[in-house]
Every structure is written in structure tokens, then in C-alpha cells.
Amino acid sequence: MRHDGPMHVQPGVGLQSDTSSSTGTGSGPADEPEAEKSAWGYLPPTAFRSRHSALSSIQQQTWERRWPQLGRQATAHSQPSARGHEPIDPIDARAWFGREAPVVLEIGCGSGTSTLAMAQAEPNVDVIAVEVYRRGLAQLLCAIDRADLQRINIRLIRGNGIDVLRDLIAPESLTGVRVFFPDPWPKARHHKRRLIQPSTVVLIADRLLPGGVFHAATDHPGYAEHIIAAGDAEPALARVDPGVDSLPVSVVRPTTKYEMKAHNAGSSINELIWKKQR
């Protein structure tokens, strides 16, 4: 999701319980991107700094009740895995959800409007929603409560999406990856901070099962071109037309308030979908 302010989460993550207060970040010391680059050999595409964000009393109560069951906190490792793209501590989705089902990872779920709607539409699919903002995750937990789902097929991770994808997701374990309206970082000098880079797409393709779907959406024409170039350059992926091609998970999204604002401002929405070749 597009974010309003800068934040930073170090690359390399594991899972632990979240012990942060309602105004805490739970992300540990925030290093400057250039220092991070010298340690890791690259500048993470999402070098943000986590901002403080107080929860309402209802959100705090829901967080305390629901998070231990549905949520995980991603924590920083000091060094990347020596195995390259191999995950450090892969999630056992079957154990976490309590069943065997297709798994979709949504990076940057925001307040979870699309997450919940798409999960409700496909109760046979399990969704892992990743977000750095605690308040957004708390809003999603409250929405899950209000929806009164017969079976909750959503789990939440608080952390940097690329790090979660790299360190917590096993190769060929996902049926889908969703990235809706990531920050376009429109200034040329900030393009290196864009979430979707060629290296990101390589990682996504590695984590997808054969036949799995990478679904991105943006209202920024320059970013759309950037995403298309990165997706089309990955030999394991082929762009598809959802109206023609058979897909294992839905690519029908709800229209969010942000999307309506973009539409009213005259922006076109670019739906970009690739399928991993068998």
C-alpha cells in the first residue's frame, strides 16, 4: 500500500511475538540506508523508518486479543542468509492456518480493505498479509472481528515485505503474491526505493508455485512501466489476461477509497498480472 511518511525496517527477518506498546514501533534501532548498504551490499527497495502510531482503545483491545493467534512480528537478522535466496526461517503455513490450502502473500496490506474482501470471496484460500504499520494491522484485525468469519483464513505479519518474502517464505510455496498500490516514489533519485524492482520480481517468481500468480496494481503510469519492464524481464513469468487465462486464485479486487480518489483525479488503474510457467 502507498504510505504517507518515511519509515525503516532492517532487512533480514525472523518471527517473534510483538511486545511493543500501542505507540511503539517494535522494529528496533533504525539505521540509515547507506549504512545498511555497506553491510548488505545493496540498498533495500523499501528503506523506510517505522513511524509511531497510537491505537484507539478498541484497536488496542482487539490487538491484545487477536494478535497472539493471528499475528507475527518480523525481527531483524544482523546478516543476510549465506544461502542467498534460501529462507532463514520459513513459515509453516499448514501449521499456522491449521489446514492444507493455497497460500497468497499480500505485501503492503494497509488497513486490509482488499485483504479481507478477497479472503471472504475465496474461503478456500489462505492469505498472509504483510504490513509495517501497526495501526493498519490493528484496523484489519478489527475488520476481521466485525466480519465474524466462520473460519479466519487471514494471518498477519508486521515487517518489511521483501524481507518476509526472502527470509520467511519457502521456494515454490505460494499460489499468489499481491502488491496493490505501492508507493511510486516518483522522483528519479528515489526510484531505487520502489518496492517492485527486477530483484524483487526474481524473488517473487522463486517463491511462486508453477502456475502461481503475481498481481500488481498501480495508478502511477511511470511506475506501471517500471513494473511491466521488471515483470516481463523475468523468464519464469508470463503476463496474462485474466479474462482469457485460467488462474488458480482470484484477481478481482474491491475498489478502495484511495482508488476512488485516484479515479476521480483522472488516474487510470493499471492491473498487471503474471503467471509462473510450469
Swiss-Prot record:
Its EC number is 2.1.1.33. GO terms for cellular component: tRNA methyltransferase complex. It comes from the Bacteria. One of its GO terms (molecular function) is tRNA (guanine(46)-N7)-methyltransferase activity. Keywords: Methyltransferase, S-adenosyl-L-methionine, Transferase, tRNA processing. The active site is at D183. InterPro entries: SAM-dependent_MTases_sf (IPR029063), tRNA_(Gua-N-7)_MeTrfase_Trmb (IPR003358), tRNA_methyltr_TrmB_bact (IPR055361). It catalyses: guanosine(46) in tRNA + S-adenosyl-L-methionine = N(7)-methylguanosine(46) in tRNA + S-adenosyl-L-homocysteine. Pathway: tRNA modification; N(7)-methylguanine-tRNA biosynthesis. It is an enzyme of class 2 (transferase). Substrate binds at K187, D219, T256, K257, Y258, E259. PROSITE patterns: SAM_MT_TRMB (PS51625). S-adenosyl-L-methionine binds at E106, E131, N160, D183. It holds the Pfam family Methyltransf_4. Residues 1-42 are annotated as: Disordered. Catalyzes the formation of N(7)-methylguanine at position 46 (m7G46) in tRNA. Belongs to the class I-like SAM-binding methyltransferase superfamily. TrmB family. This is tRNA (guanine-N(7)-)-methyltransferase.
